[in-house]
Structures are given as structure tokens and as C-alpha cells.
Amino acid sequence: MQDQKAYQKLVESLNQHSYQYYVLDDPIISDPQYDVLYQKLLRIEDEHPDWILPESPSQRIGDEPLKEFHTVRHAVPMYSLDNAFEDDELKSFLKRIEEKLPDQKSLAFSAEPKMDGLAINIRYENGQLVQATTRGDGQVGEDVTHNIRPIYSVPLKLFGNNWPEVVEVRGEVFMSKSAFEQLNEHQQEIGGKIFANPRNAAAGSLRQLDSKVAAKRHLSFFLYGWGELSDDWQLPQYYSEMIEQLVEWGLPANPQSEIISGLEGMFAYYEKIQAKRSELPYEIDGIVYKLNDIKLQQQLGFTARAPRWAIARKFPAEEVWTKLLDIEVQVGRTGAITPVARLQPVSVGGVIVSNATLHNMDEIKRKDVRIGDTVIVRRAGDVIPEVVGPILTQRPENTQLFEMPQHCPECGSDVVKELDKAVFRCTGGLVCPAQRKRALHHFVSRKAMDIQGLGDKLIDQLVDKGWVKHPDDFYHLTVEKLATLERMAEKSAQNVITGIQASLETTLAKFIYSLGIPEVGEVTAKNLANHFKDLNAIKQAEFEELITLNDVGEVVAEHIVNFFKEPHNESVIQGLLDAGMHWPTPETTLVNEDSPFANKVVVLTGTLSEMSRPEAKVLLEAQGAKITGSVSAKTDYVIAGEKAGSKLTKAESLGVAVLSEAEWLAMMPQQD
């Protein structure tokens, strides 16, 4: 597609699909279909960087991190809300309004869950998102535009065309429960900071100078109001009507919102939302009631800090004390060892809790939690029970300090602590039951052993039946055995066995990669193979030699040493060799160190006439080059084919050497 109007239509279509998915929760195409369209968009923009629209989905994430945050004064102050913690306080609120509006017989309120997030002001000018600001002190906030743009529920351009020249939308940025769990799981795996709750995680994400970090954390947004509007814009009669208008322009509102009447309506709505609180996919900490009539809002006005026409009815806190009976450990699918508190069962927020996370050893030491303590337990996020800390005044004399086990409770392999990280990890990657399925999925993957016909579901079935525990077990399967599986005909079974046997002929680099050594990716595996040229040499390599290799730092070197030191892993490797696993002799994998591309970082862009990009990648890697997908100051060469786009532009701006296809081929060493 080379038509600019068609490109514009594609941008419009992708934005509409994002709206259907993130705002309406009603997608009309599948995720893979969206991905196809998005990749198509990226290809067009790579070829035609001058076509790129500011509202394109590709423009949500910036290239360069900010150096610092800048303050912004709000055009209209961002007020807080008064809180009500008891029913009597809600009654007093309603009574004050009724006294100030004696002519109003029945007052309608908009009621909505109070999101446990961060208030944000998003400014649109001529329909385009131009700035996003935190509440700050209500008068001055911080510019966080770069971290709001990656939120897919926030449109970069408003829908329709009937919006005012200036419109400021106000709402809450939050992190869903599922996104929060995924983030903490990732933080646990890498030994990073564990967040106490989704609100803290969302706040930490907005405080990132690099938008790429915030983008990975999957923040969400619900609007709750507006700030500055163009003078010529006529507000509707009701608050709910203005919210509906903002939704029509592409912004998401909380679907749980309702219009209620009087004190009975307030109580009924509170009870209804509190009852479904744990089922909601996000955190809430109360209910917000707002007078629905905008003219009556204006008549009541504001105090120094809050509107007189709105109030937040807060939910009660959910923390209790109980006894910490023991601390045990669980082994995650990546081998991370996580301490878990075993508690005297206690009701927290209506749920019986007997286990709670302690995150990692550093957290246990920081909180000084000991076995036998009386501890505070919180249902962090209403879902994940967490030990907040001990009640020191209740500490008995016979408490025990917890020590991380030296051997994995699942497989007996050594447990090691990663350098400069909080995480402890089991080294039995090939044999540990807790890591088994993940290790086997990786072993058969396309860039590893590339075993045709062995999909994840079939592997899970083989593991569940006890037929496959370790990678070498694949090579003892038979057609007759596989054919007994449900939905597995003899021909299909034969195809699987053929694929397994074909994988016995591989390369040293693929074999190393297939082992699933932590932090050892495809490039590192190739560097190891090219440097040592022999499996035994890699297995016997010392830490000091490993860290001299390209792409191998101290952490990776430690993982490699620990992996090959573990006898269980050695047993599986020997089993694979006994099954007939082999690769070409070292001479055929030697890298020409005299090649101009040896140990160089190379980027391919545009269309090549002599071969495809994957074919070019193979040729360059054979010369010792490292192929990357983006241009940076560390790039040595950019090889530019026809219709090279933004990568070529960036290379020229950074002063990176650019080669045409002909120039590159001329530099390649001639084959004997």
C-alpha cells in the first residue's frame, strides 16, 4: 500500500479498534488480526516517515527518555474531595445541600466507584492530545504527557469533530489487578522492587522519565470530569450528559456509574458496589457522589479545597493481626524462590486468609519478620494477601529468623542468589518439576531445537502423563505410545517422531540456547559457540573468561557457571548426547575474525534486491556480526536497501556508517 489516504484510513481503523477494545470492551477483531494491521502500519511508516500522523498508534511511545519533569499550572484548579467514613457523615452532606437548595424537592446524584489511582488532567487542543498533568497541589502539577500517551484507552485524537477548540478531561490513571500481578511477578523474577498495591505501582509508573517503562506496565484510565473548556462551548444541563459526550469523543468512563436519588439511593448503591468490590478488575476505595445538575453545582460552588456538591464515601480499611506460624518457599516457573507466610487463619475483608506473600529475602529482612511474630496482614488490592510487618510489642522471646534454603525443595538442586538482585533461584533448570513445562516449551521452540509437531498443549499432555520429565525423554518416545493419546492418529504420531529425530542434527549455538540457561539468549549462545567452539570447553569455562566475551556480563557469566555446575543438568545433557544429538565440526562454525563485520553491530533496513533480510542476517552472523532491530549510537553499520525509512534517517543523524546493498556485498569476504 503506497497511497497516503489509505494510510490515514489505516490509522483511523486501528484507533477505532483500540476504542472498541479498551473503552467499550467489545472488540470486533481478534488480537492477531490487530497485530497484522499494526505491523502493516509500521512497515508503511518505515517507508514513508513523512506520512506519520501524531495520532498514529506508533506514536504513543517516545524515542528518548526525559531528563526531568516540568511543572504546569492548571488553567482550572484540580480540587480534592471531602470524605465520609460513616453513614452519618453522608447524611450531614446531603442535609447541607438541601439547606442551601430549599426549592429542590428531589436531588439526583451521579454515583461511581472511587478509583484507587491518580488524578490526571489531559488537555486536547483542536482534538489533539497536547498535554497531561498530575494533580500536584491542585494548582500546579507535573507534566507526564509522555507516560499518558502509551495508555491505549486514552485517544491521541478525539473522535468526531464537534469538540471545542480546548477541552481538558480529568480522570484517574490506575493499574488493573491483572496488570499489577503480572508486574510484580516480573519484578520478582528480575529481583526488582515489589509494589505494595496497584496504586503505588501506577504512581511509580507515572514517575518514570522513560515512557517505554510506563508503556510496559499497562496502565488504564477512567474519566470523571473536565477542566478548562473553550468559552464558546455550551455545557449540557447534567453532569452525566457531559460524561456521555466525552465518551462519544473516545474517552472511557466507569461502566458501573449510575444516577441515583436521595439518601436511600446512596446507601443502596454503596452496598451494591461494596458487595461486588472483589469481583471488579480494578481497585476501588469508596464511592463518589456528585450532584447531577450542573447549574446546581455552580450555585453551591467550592470550599478552599473541595466542591460542596460532591463527596467520597470511603470503604473501611482491611487490615488485621494474626500469628505467623511458619515461612515456606515456593518455586516459580522461572526458578525464582519466593518465601510464603503460613498464617493462623483469619478473616480479612470477608475472606479467610491462611497464606500471604513475603516477596523476597530482602523484604523479610527490611520488615524484620520472624516466625512466631504477630503480624499485620493486608489484603493488598483486595486480592493478594500481604504481610505488612510485625507488631514488635507482641513479639515473644522464641521467634525464629528465616533462612533461605540452600537446596530447591522441588528438585534438590542448588539455590543461588543472583548478583546485585533480591531474587534467589533454583539452578536445576532442566530437571526442576516447577520449571519443567516452561523448560520443555523452550527446548522445542523454533529458535532452539525447532521440533515440528510438538506444540505446547501436546508437551503439557506428555508431562501430565509422566512420559516426559526432561528434554532427553522426547527421544525415547515411540509412534505406538503417542498414538494412544486422545486425538492423536498414527500418522500424526509419526510426524511428531520424525520431527523429534530430525532435531538431533543441530548446531552448537542452538543446542546451548535450547538448554534455557537464565539470561542466555540466541545472540549470547552464538557468541559462546563461536568463541569456545566445543561444548566441553563451554561447560568448563571459568567466570573470568566468560565475562570477557561480547554480550556476557557478570550476571550472565554466573548463570552459565551455576548451570553447568549442577549435576542434574549435566545428566540431562549427557542423555541428549547419548540419544544422538550432534552438530557440525568446529571448523564449519568458525567466524572469520578478519571480516570487517566481525563483532560489529549491524542494522538492516529497506528492501534488498539480492536476497531477503533473513538471508542477509544469516550471512552477516556467519561473519561474526550482531544484528539488531534499532539504530543507536552503538550501531557500527546500517545496510540500507530500497525504500529505507526512519532507521536510515536516524543513522544519518547519529553519524552511523551507512552502506548500500552493493557496498555491503563488496565488503563481504569472498568464499573459497
Curated annotation (Swiss-Prot):
Annotated keywords: DNA damage, DNA repair, DNA replication, Ligase, Magnesium, Manganese, Metal-binding, NAD, Zinc
Metal-binding recorded as keyword: yes
Gene name of the encoded protein: ligA
InterPro entries in the cross-refs: BRCT_dom, BRCT_dom_sf, DisA/LigA_HHH, DNA_ligase, DNA_ligase_AS, DNA_ligase_CS, DNAligase_adenylation, DNAligase_N
Any single biological process term in GO: DNA replication
Positions of Zn(2+) binding: 408, 411, 426, 432
Cited function: DNA ligase that catalyzes the formation of phosphodiester linkages between 5'-phosphoryl and 3'-hydroxyl groups in double-stranded DNA using NAD as a coenzyme and as the energy source for the reaction. It is essential for DNA replication and repair of damaged DNA.
Catalytic residue list: 114 (n6-amp-lysine intermediate)
Taxonomy, superkingdom: Bacteria
EC top class named in words: ligase
Protein name, UniProt field: DNA ligase
Reaction equations catalysed: NAD(+) + (deoxyribonucleotide)n-3'-hydroxyl + 5'-phospho-(deoxyribonucleotide)m = (deoxyribonucleotide)n+m + AMP + beta-nicotinamide D-nucleotide
A molecular-function term among this protein's GO annotations: DNA ligase (NAD+) activity
Domain BRCT positions: 592-672
Family: Belongs to the NAD-dependent DNA ligase family. LigA subfamily.
